[in-house]
């Protein structure tokens, strides 16, 4: 098997990297979107179903305090980053090792 130079290897390797990066981006975006939707739904259910919150003032106050739509805590965001890098490294590794072994 002939050895590939760097200039010959890069064009063959780039499509795989871009494909798997886009897959990992979609997975991470879906995870973050799911977390935001779940947080919003949880806040909405707490405001509408709680029997104690009947008058408008306390409902508005509760909405102001708890209606921030986003990630519930930063630890979950770091978990999503780890998942992202895991998928990226897991999916790209066979091709990377294949091309690196040709050197």
Swiss-Prot record:
The places in or outside the cell where this protein is found are: Endoplasmic reticulum membrane
Transmembrane segment boundaries: 13-33, 77-97
Which key words are in the record? Endoplasmic reticulum, Membrane, Transmembrane, Transmembrane helix
Q: Its membrane topology, per UniProt?
A: Multi-pass membrane protein
Q: Name one GO cellular component term.
A: endoplasmic reticulum
Know the name of this protein? Uncharacterized membrane protein PB8E5.08
């Amino acid at each position: 098997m002939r050895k590939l130079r760097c200039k010959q290897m890069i064009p063959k390797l780039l499509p795989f990297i871009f494909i798997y990066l886009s897959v990992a981006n979609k997975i991470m975006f879906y995870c973050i979107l799911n977390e935001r939707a779940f947080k919003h739904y949880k806040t909405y259910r707490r405001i509408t179903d709680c029997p104690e919150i009947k008058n408008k003032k306390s409902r508005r106050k509760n909405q102001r305090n708890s209606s921030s739509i986003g990630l519930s805590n930063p630890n979950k965001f770091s978990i999503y980053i780890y998942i992202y890098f895991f998928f990226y490294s897991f999916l790209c590794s066979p091709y990377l090792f294949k091309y690196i072994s040709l050197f």
